[in-house]
């Protein structure tokens, strides 16, 4: 009964148009002060202790690094390198877009940032070369979602904070699924381009490819710094995030020199605004998780599902459907922070690995970024292409279907996400 009251109250507040962060906080306060005897001091204490976790600091640092890389010329050099490698195949610039998104995802940690950085440069070039606008938008919108699967990933950090799962293990677990999804999206792009005889670029020699690689090497080296540092134990994921922010600043301002010192304050301010928004959501989500735990709702749900004889296969199917539906009304950060603390105890009781479960949730969030009505990547791509959301939704379907097939693969083949972290000894 209490669970029903909590969720009805939350959805009613959300339907009024109230921001999700305020809806969460108001739901918790209303329920606690009208239905329980919890002292107000404990709520205030939870607000501060809930966001004291060291791992949370990774979020603003990865956001800052992504902003420096977006404005610092790294994306343009990655696109040039990707184009030199695959531009001569069917749908050359489209394939270059997939590859560039995968490379930028490995240094940014954010899907919308990837779409902005790659799409703002590549989409006008694709239209100019004769590609239909819908084709380019479909490629970049869906490939940009790799930003939260290929590590580092802000969504994985949020899952880690919500469930106390190792961030390092999650990052390593996202590598193979991320590369596989990039390959599948590339194959979809190639197939559609070949079917419709879209333009190809002239093949360039290895000298030009080597030159493009050297120009992009400073950006690509950040992948080695972050992942290599975590794997070797040189620094924690949070320290890796701080290192990536400093490294991105140095590369953007002093190496590539595409950004002057006068632009740095604006980048810092934009990063602070985005970080404040996410941290405010996290703060209220921590309160919501505290309420769930105090009312023993996750435990009750786990006992009920197990009592009904629901096994891991059926449970994971239910989770996928639930998360895809949630993606229609909420953005990924809110979904992870609300749903992970509820679903995680059930998953562990059913013997599902926490790292595998985290990758499954992340892939669901990727799909949610690309379908209406609140798919963030759709709105970002719409701003770049000036296409309507309905038109964009139709354009992304071939790639979205590929992502749904991949979701099934990730869900029911755990070694896909677990093999690498186990082989590296991080879990």
Predicted regions and their residues:
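Alpha-helical transmembrane segments of multi-pass membrane transport proteins
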Residues: 1-427
């Amino acid at each position: 009964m209490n669970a029903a009251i909590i969720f009805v109250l939350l959805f009613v507040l959300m339907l009024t148009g109230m921001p999700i962060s305020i809806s969460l906080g108001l739901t918790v306060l209303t329920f606690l002060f009208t239905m329980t005897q919890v002292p107000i001091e404990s709520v205030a204490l939870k607000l501060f202790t809930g966001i004291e976790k060291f791992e949370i600091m990774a979020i603003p640092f990865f956001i800052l690094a992504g902003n420096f890389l977006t404005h610092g010329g790294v994306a343009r050099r990655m696109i040039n390198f990707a184009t030199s490698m695959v531009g001569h195949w069917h749908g050359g610039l489209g394939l270059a877009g997939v590859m560039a998104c995968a490379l930028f995802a490995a240094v940014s940690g954010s899907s919308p940032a990837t779409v902005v950085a790659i799409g703002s440069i590549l989409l006008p070039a694709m239209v100019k070369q004769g590609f239909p606008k819908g084709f380019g938008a479909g490629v970049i919108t869906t490939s940009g979602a790799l930003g939260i699967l290929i590590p580092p990933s802000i969504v994985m950090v949020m899952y880690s904070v919500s469930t106390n799962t190792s961030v390092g293990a999650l990052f390593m677990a996202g590598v193979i699924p991320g590369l596989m999804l990039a390959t599948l999206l590339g194959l979809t792009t190639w197939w559609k381009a070949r079917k419709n005889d879209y333009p190809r670029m002239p093949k360039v020699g290895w000298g030009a490819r080597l030159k493009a690689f050297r120009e992009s090497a400073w950006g690509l080296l950040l992948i080695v710094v972050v992942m290599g540092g975590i794997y070797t134990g040189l620094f924690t994921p949070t320290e890796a995030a701080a290192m990536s922010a400093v490294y991105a600043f140095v590369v953007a301002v002093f190496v590539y020199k595409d950004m002057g010192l006068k632009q740095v304050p604006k980048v810092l301010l934009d990063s602070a605004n985005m970080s404040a928004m996410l941290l405010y959501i996290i703060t209220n989500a921590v309160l919501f998780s505290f309420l769930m735990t105090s009312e023993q709702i996750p435990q009750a749900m786990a006992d009920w599902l197990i009592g009904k004889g629901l096994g891991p296969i059926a449970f994971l199917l239910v989770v996928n459907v639930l998360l895809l539906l949630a993606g229609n009304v909420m953005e990924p950060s809110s979904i992870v922070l609300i749903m992970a603390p509820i679903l995680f105890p059930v998953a562990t009781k059913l013997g599902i690995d926490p790292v595998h479960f985290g990758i499954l949730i992340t892939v669901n969030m990727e799909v949610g970024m690309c379908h209406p009505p609140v798919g963030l990547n759709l709105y970002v791509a719409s701003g770049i292409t000036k296409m309507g959301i309905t038109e964009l939704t139709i354009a992304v379907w071939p790639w979205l279907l590929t992502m749904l097939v991949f979701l099934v693969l990730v869900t029911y083949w755990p070694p896909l996400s677990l093999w690498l972290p186990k082989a590296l000894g991080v879990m």
